[in-house]
Amino acid sequence: MEEVCEGKEFSFPRQEEDVLSFWTEIDAFKTQLKRTENLPEYIFYDGPPFATGLPHYGHILAGTIKDIVTRYQTMTGHHVTRRFGWDCHGLPVENEIDRKLNIKRRDEVIKMGIDKYNEECRSIVTRYVAEWEKVITRCGRWIDFKNDYKTMDLPFMESVWWVFSQLWEKNLVYRGFKVMPYSTGCKTPLSNFEAGQNYKEVPDPEIMVTFPVIGDQDNAAFVAWTTTPWTLPSNLALCVNAKFVYVKVRNKNTGKVYIVAESRLSALPTDKPKAKLSNGPAGDTKKANPKAKGAKPESAADSYEVLEKFNGASLVGKKYEPLFDYFSDFSSEAFRVVADDYVTDDSGTGIVHCAPAFGEDDYRVCLLNKIIKKGENLVVAVDDDGLFTERITHFSGRYVKDADKDIIEAVKAKGRLVKTGSFTHSYPFCWRSDTPLIYRAVPSWFVRVEQLKEKLLKSNEQTEWVPGYVKDKRFHNWLENARDWAISRSRFWGTPLPIWISDDGEEVVIMDSVEKLEKLSGVKVFDLHRHHIDHITIPSSRGDEFGVLRRVEDVFDCWFESGSMPYAYIHYPFENKELFEKNFPGDFVAEGLDQTRGWFYTLMVLSTALFEKPAFKNLICNGLVLAEDGKKMAKKLRNYPPPLEVIDEYGADAVRLYLINSPVVRAEPLRFKKEGVLGVVKDVFLPWYNAYRFLVQNAKRLETEGGVPFVPTDLATIQSANILDQWIHSATQSLVRFVREEMDAYRLYTVVPRLLKFLDNLTNIYVRFNRKRLKGRTGEDDCHTALSTLFNVLLTSCKVMAPFTPFFTETLYQNLRKACKGSEESVHYCSIPPREGMEGERIELSVTRMMKIIDLARNIRERNKLPLKTPLKEMIVVHPDADFLNDITGVLREYVLEELNVRSLVPCNDTLKYASLKAEPDFSVLGKRLGKSMGLVAKEVKEMSQKDILAFEEAGEVTIANHLLKETDIKIVRVFKRPDDLKENEIDSAGDGDVLVILDLRADDSLVEAGFAREIVNRIQKLRKKSGLEPTDFVEVYFQSLDEDESVSKQVLVSQEQNIKDSIGSTLLLSSLMPSHAVIIADETFTPKETSDESVKKVPKLSYKISLARPALKFNEEAVLALYSGDVKSATGLQTYLLSRDHSNLKSEFQAGDGKITVSCIENVPVATVVLGEHLHLSVGDDLLSKRNA
């Protein structure tokens, strides 16, 4: 393995760029696909985005989820084809061209020419493809852009034709009028899910108008309420509820007689009318989600006299005088009262005015009552631009919303205005043009979705969603209330409907392929867009006298195209028939929550209609990524950092991990914070990198000391008696099992936290607690075992983490693989490791318990301002379970003592010796179960005696107030009892309700000395770091007392010599032993500071100097002189020569010569054999040890 730099010098973004270059060099993605082509297929459908805008964090999130799953499936033995796709048709593209060419009206497109318009559309479809590829590739996602699919390509469009033809054959398609949300800005109807994407709070007028009853003896008039005055010119009926009671009332002041629902009499104006009205009309469907903010009307009891009461059913059939005469030709069928249950009495007047061309319920009710006929005499008096047609003579050419005020004035002039006002409510706007939507009847082609409802619900049950509640609630409810789907659009740039109709409408031919069109028309077809096929006619099969069939003008809703993607992207059924039929439904899809009403829905509808099965088996639904302020991310608001800017600063892996380790993978919203990405770097990647670097450093040290390359022992054959080796091996197996189980269930939200917890345990438990072993302080064999364990765990974690953080794992893997024979060229060619060996649940539990004890003890230290360098005398662990105490006081005892800097650990299973017990009922568990009994049970639980609680802990259950309570129902809290002979500042405790940890805070002389020794060690380590030394760099450390009385420091150094040596890896030398030729690397002087910290006050106030020096040769002067029979000049020449040599080379020569070297290169000095240990030592420390041993 190669040396690696310090974490602070390591650039995550730069190493990712290097990895990208490496992947390009080895053609990694293509190679992976080639290597897996004979493995079972895993079918992934990638929803096509529009390329008319740049990718944002929502795209990156969904792309990351897709990349993780497909990488994982590849690494678990599948061939995963990943083709990117583009949604090329529809409003987004046309809007861009309309803005570019300043096109406002449909007829401007016709005048320009559909051919020119469509080619303009085609020219911008792939405008941002390069940018998309750049961002997606930089994010680490592997997907095929070269073999992408486009919804505008002929093979794709041909398959869409085939899908439609199958629906036609199943009698699932019909033509009719449907009142739909309509965008006057884009001149097209919108689907219901499109209409719900852009609501705004806006003011609108609201009025009450009269419709005089023909032939009524009291000259009564029906009163209707509406928020859409512009629909009044198209009124054809009034609707009541047959079950309601209606009243005929006379205004006591004006004498006017009105008919309204009895329960809505209060809505009529009083003598002092209010400016604001009620919250909304009774069942008025021409408004959109009204939420009026009007004042509550006064009582009308004093202003009106009730003349008559009658049931709504009795009003049915009564004729009334229309407001306007624009529809006088409908008089025989229209201008009468009908009844329907959609009329409510929670607002309005209980009477709804019906304009069937502009209200969904209006249309249904008028059709049901034969005021209009299906597909025939419906007159839509508003054109595609939202302007009144010539039929509405007084307002012809006016935009409907702009005409509201004048229409109100016209009603007032006719004496028909009862009341007027305004209110603010939530109203839908076009998600593309940002213009207010209207509801308008449009001729359209429909898929009979309502007819498929039961099959859709059945298909939904065959799928697995993450999170599940989105499927069971949101999507299920949407399917349950599904309406027929208008699949046609009166637009230009899209896949044309393959419907050819004769002039008399009697003959209809559906094209299911290009071949059929060419055969019937005799025209060669190379493109299916409108300007290439609109002119194509086919002869009538009835004979020449019936003329020809022409294509209808409409194109498909682009959602129909994307819903056809599973078939069209592989040109089914014209190609890949076996591939599709063998692997349908697909295995996996993933998009945002908004697609429950979009792509997920259209996929489900079409696959159920075609095959009576879902299009996919598994689905991950992510939430919305919002700006930090909680608002939707928007370029114009500049409320989010550009994705590439964040990636260039912190790396794509950090962005990926930040996104997928958040609520957004549970379909909840995420407020994106750049600081959160930085947090991932600091909390995950830097510790992970440092653990890896620590391995490399110590493996290189072992190589240097042993003279042979480091070859790790295989994980399966490591035989280690070390408890932490066994633990991390077991934890790794548990991790592999958990990741496989949860990833197979697509639960990323459980996998990622577990992965990060494992990395945290690896760095903060295994590496931290094993530093001495890993540094070789416990012997070469034990060091090799520890390093092999760390190596194998890091290698396994690289493979398991590879789908999540593809860059960093590749970087680590490329260096780690240098120590492995026969390793794969890339980590992404590897398999997710299988479980190797048994998991040690007992060992994992033991270490978990150890960490619980350590965390509680750290809390006590922090609370008492006692840093870890301050040694403590004793820790007591109180727990009733002997196994728990054995875990802590057995093989893990030394780790606990060393980590907490405590001298002794005392187990105690007598829970009442140091604590009193309290029982607390778990209300969250018991509340629902016990209901009204909860109060009594809670009272008795809290009153349980110490004896009762101990008995409950032993038995695991207790009966209270005739209810059997288990361990999970009651929380036992241990409250610390301080011994009477100790003061409050001499002892403290911490507990978690299960275990109690007690620390003796008193100091004694031995502890003070140990504390001073720990301080010295800490100073040395900081000086090493400050000097830029690597952990593998060997230096000698010298101590010099600066106090007049050096006896105190010497006493400490003697008593703590072994502890210091264990910590720094060498003997701490007195400065008096430093040779004159020693090379000092760094030194620093330390003097005690005044402090109020009681723990520090007890440490002796000593001044001293620490020096770090390169290892210096220590000569035995007498033995060197004897080599030359007392010739001082020759002896001095030898010493000078040896001091000039590189220390490490000299050491190697002695090792090679079995402790001897022959020196023959000194001019005028005889040849001499120098013996290590006899004539010199390679360091002062070696010399000192030799003298002591002698």
UniProtKB/Swiss-Prot annotation:
EC numbers on record: 6.1.1.5
Residues binding ATP: K635
GO MF entries: aminoacyl-tRNA deacylase activity; ATP binding; isoleucine-tRNA ligase activity; tRNA binding
GO cellular component: cytosol
Pfam families according to UniProt: Anticodon_1, DUF5915, tRNA-synt_1
Motif position, 'HIGH' region: 49-59
GO biological process, one term: post-embryonic development
Motif 'KMSKS' region positions after renumbering to this chain: 632-636
Catalysis performed (reactions): tRNA(Ile) + L-isoleucine + ATP = L-isoleucyl-tRNA(Ile) + AMP + diphosphate
Keywords annotated in UniProt: Aminoacyl-tRNA synthetase, ATP-binding, Cytoplasm, Ligase, Nucleotide-binding, Protein biosynthesis
Compartments, as annotated in UniProt: Cytoplasm, Cytosol
The protein, known as: Isoleucine--tRNA ligase, cytoplasmic
Organism listed in the record: Arabidopsis thaliana (Mouse-ear cress)
Taxonomic lineage of the native organism: Eukaryota, Viridiplantae, Streptophyta, Embryophyta, Tracheophyta
